[in-house]
Amino acid sequence: MTRFTSIGLCAVLLFNVCSCATLQKDTIASMLKKGNSPRVTRQRRQLPSPCGSLQPGQLCCDSYKYNPVTHLCCNDNPAVKPASPTAIPGCCDQSAYDRNTHLCCDATLSPHPPATTLPACCGPVVYDSSVNSTQLCCAGAVLNKPVGVPRALCCGTATYNPATQVCCMGFPVPKAGGPNATSLCCGPFSYDISTQMCCNGNIALKSATHTHCCGMFSFNPATHLCCNGYPYPKLGFISPSCCGSLVYDTLTMRCCDGSHVVLITPNQDPCANLA
């Protein structure tokens, strides 16, 4: 009797264990079918807001609550929007401002200057950048245009008159050849492109024949060769070429070791005797 009782109890326990396992399996399968699981549900749970519970229409600005209708979040600070109905609100560091009336320059808020048609930033300062303005922003500083020079431009930290000057290496330089000449820079100097050339940082004379540079010099390629940065006459050779700083005729001569010129001898190596 005891033996049968033990067998019965084991059967009941085994049935319960199997039933629990089956129920748990069915429950997990059902949750997976619906697209969630205990782990997934835990991952999808939203983190608490850093500024606590929000009312409808509220947003978080760092740890502060604010109403985006009346405020802007400026650098983690709720700032009151400009009151004007036509304002174009913007942030300047932690403050809100109206873009129609102010400019934010290097986190500094400044009003538009009076009678300014095209306000702009020059470092932390506001200036009038319009064509007819009397000011220029040069290297981060506001400079006044010279009197009577409405088309003045910047040259480094100074202004210059492009009608009479050129800007060479950050400095205003008078135009070579006068105001009506076309001048360019050759290093820190200006030169007249109609009568001069810039050859390797040196201003050389230009003519109808001297139209090319050879080192720091101008030369006539029809009558001279440029050898090692210096012009040398072709000496009437039919096929002239350079051998170092020497000019030779390739039809009758040979250049040996890049510095010696010898006559070509039939059936002999002209450079052999130089060894």
Swiss-Prot record:
Keyword hit for Membrane: no
Statement: the UniProt record of this protein carries the keyword DNA repair: no
Keywords: Secreted, Signal
GO cellular component: extracellular region
Pfam family, one: Galaxin_repeat
Primary location class: secreted
InterPro entries tied to this protein: Galaxin-like, Galaxin_dom
Superkingdom: Eukaryota
Annotated tissue distribution: Component of the acid-insoluble and acid-soluble organic matrix of the aragonitic skeleton (at protein level).
Signal peptide residues on this chain, from the entry's feature table: 1-20
Annotated localization: Secreted
Protein name: Galaxin-2
Species this chain originates from: Acropora millepora
